[in-house]
Amino acid sequence: MEVMQVLHMNRGNGENSYAKNSTVQSKIISIGKPIIEEAVHEISCNNVLESMGIADLGCSSGPNTLCVISEIMDMVQATSHRLGHPVPEFRLYLNDLYSNDFNSIFMSLPAFYHRLKEEKGIGCGSCFISGVAGSFYGRLFPSKSLHYVHSSSSLHWLSQVPPGLESNAVTPLNKGKVYISKSSPHSVLHAYSLQFQNDFPMFIESRSQELVSGGRMVLSLFGRRSTDPTTEESCYQWELLAQAIMSLVREGLIEEEKVDSFNTPFYAPCAEEIKVEIQKEGSFIIDRLEGFEIDWDGGAVSDVHTAQGKLLIGQRAAKALRAVVESMLESHFGIGQDIMDDLFSRYAEIVGNHLSKTRTKYFNLVISLTRKG
């Protein structure tokens, strides 16, 4: 799978779009807001800037995209006013992979600029927004051009499927699974860990060149508390997806060989793994490294023990995952809309049954970093 060409959130504003099904990601941004505010405040306190470079890496599309940069601008403006500093010009860079729905973002900019002018008094001559297509596992910006980097719900995606997993052997390495599971052999766990150890330092090293001395970076991604990569909080959504896919295999709707050759380019690290890679690279001070839980549906359904509650939470969790992974499933399995609908209907039922018994939650890590001088 060519991840950089295939991976994108569902486009547009339809029923299955990311724009309509990104409540979990929005909640993650909201919970992490105090940490973002702290970082932005320190930049504004320590510098009187004429122009401020801000990048959102893995911006996707939909309401979360412009909401994030709007809130960062609010923070800078409020701190500047308190200190009696002039509000800097804003250079805002929205980055994602080439197949991201940048058109939707650009179409929403006129209304966004209008709100900036009406609500904040910031005109188009003081705010410059650019789309930057490319992988953040490499350089994206000129040296020392950024003051703040934000990335939320993106760094758990790997640059590629770990090498060696797509085996042509008689018995596939991760048979019947789409990610790490309790039954995965150690070689699968090791391959995913190695890919993270390759990708994450490339991200950190690239940002170290692009950020000014004292620049700040706040990263948020799915992770896990335990050092064990097979824990439910990091794996079970994929385990249940594999169950739904295998039910289609048993009915002859999907080829089993296709399942055995599909491996999700995702990795949920523990805090220690992140800490080790940051310290090894050496360009950043870790100011904060924290974690928190979040419901699979973003906490929208409170009572999951009734038939209606079980149905609703399953449907919401299924729509949230579909908005994120449909592009990869469509590319790999080559299935049409009817089978895709069937797959996520089955997944919704499986998830509803599971969450009515055990309220498994995602675990999210937030890291706040300062570029060393």
UniProtKB/Swiss-Prot annotation:
<dbReference type="GO" id="GO:0030795">
    <property type="term" value="F:methyl jasmonate methylesterase activity"/>
</dbReference>
<keyword id="KW-0539">Nucleus</keyword>
<feature type="binding site">
    <location>
        <position position="156"/>
    </location>
    <ligand>
        <name>jasmonate</name>
    </ligand>
</feature>
<feature type="binding site">
    <location>
        <position position="64"/>
    </location>
    <ligand>
        <name>S-adenosyl-L-homocysteine</name>
    </ligand>
</feature>
<feature type="binding site">
    <location>
        <position position="263"/>
    </location>
    <ligand>
        <name>Mg(2+)</name>
    </ligand>
</feature>
<dbReference type="GO" id="GO:0008757">
    <property type="term" value="F:S-adenosylmethionine-dependent methyltransferase activity"/>
</dbReference>
<feature type="binding site">
    <location>
        <position position="18"/>
    </location>
    <ligand>
        <name>S-adenosyl-L-homocysteine</name>
    </ligand>
</feature>
<keyword id="KW-0963">Cytoplasm</keyword>
<dbReference type="InterPro" id="IPR029063">
    <property type="entry name" value="SAM-dependent_MTases_sf"/>
</dbReference>
<protein>
    <recommendedName>
        <fullName>Probable jasmonic acid carboxyl methyltransferase 1</fullName>
        <ecNumber>2.1.1.141</ecNumber>
    </recommendedName>
</protein>
<comment type="similarity">
    <text>Belongs to the methyltransferase superfamily. Type-7 methyltransferase family.</text>
</comment>
<dbReference type="GO" id="GO:0005737">
    <property type="term" value="C:cytoplasm"/>
</dbReference>
<feature type="binding site">
    <location>
        <position position="59"/>
    </location>
    <ligand>
        <name>S-adenosyl-L-homocysteine</name>
    </ligand>
</feature>
<comment type="function">
    <text>Catalyzes the methylation of jasmonate into methyljasmonate, a plant volatile that acts as an important cellular regulator mediating diverse developmental processes and defense responses.</text>
</comment>
<feature type="binding site">
    <location>
        <position position="135"/>
    </location>
    <ligand>
        <name>S-adenosyl-L-homocysteine</name>
    </ligand>
</feature>
<feature type="site" description="Involved in substrate discrimination">
    <location>
        <position position="150"/>
    </location>
</feature>
<dbReference type="GO" id="GO:0005634">
    <property type="term" value="C:nucleus"/>
</dbReference>
<feature type="site" description="Involved in substrate discrimination">
    <location>
        <position position="222"/>
    </location>
</feature>
<feature type="binding site">
    <location>
        <position position="260"/>
    </location>
    <ligand>
        <name>Mg(2+)</name>
    </ligand>
</feature>
<dbReference type="GO" id="GO:0032259">
    <property type="term" value="P:methylation"/>
</dbReference>
<feature type="binding site">
    <location>
        <position position="262"/>
    </location>
    <ligand>
        <name>Mg(2+)</name>
    </ligand>
</feature>
<dbReference type="InterPro" id="IPR005299">
    <property type="entry name" value="MeTrfase_7"/>
</dbReference>
<dbReference type="Pfam" id="PF03492">
    <property type="entry name" value="Methyltransf_7"/>
</dbReference>
<keyword id="KW-0489">Methyltransferase</keyword>
<dbReference type="GO" id="GO:0031408">
    <property type="term" value="P:oxylipin biosynthetic process"/>
</dbReference>
<feature type="binding site">
    <location>
        <position position="97"/>
    </location>
    <ligand>
        <name>S-adenosyl-L-homocysteine</name>
    </ligand>
</feature>
<comment type="pathway">
    <text>Lipid metabolism; oxylipin biosynthesis.</text>
</comment>
<feature type="binding site">
    <location>
        <position position="174"/>
    </location>
    <ligand>
        <name>Mg(2+)</name>
    </ligand>
</feature>
<feature type="binding site">
    <location>
        <position position="96"/>
    </location>
    <ligand>
        <name>S-adenosyl-L-homocysteine</name>
    </ligand>
</feature>
<feature type="binding site">
    <location>
        <position position="136"/>
    </location>
    <ligand>
        <name>S-adenosyl-L-homocysteine</name>
    </ligand>
</feature>
<keyword id="KW-0479">Metal-binding</keyword>
<keyword id="KW-0808">Transferase</keyword>
<dbReference type="GO" id="GO:0046872">
    <property type="term" value="F:metal ion binding"/>
</dbReference>
<feature type="binding site">
    <location>
        <position position="157"/>
    </location>
    <ligand>
        <name>jasmonate</name>
    </ligand>
</feature>
<feature type="binding site">
    <location>
        <position position="25"/>
    </location>
    <ligand>
        <name>jasmonate</name>
    </ligand>
</feature>
<keyword id="KW-0460">Magnesium</keyword>
<dbReference type="InterPro" id="IPR042086">
    <property type="entry name" value="MeTrfase_capping"/>
</dbReference>
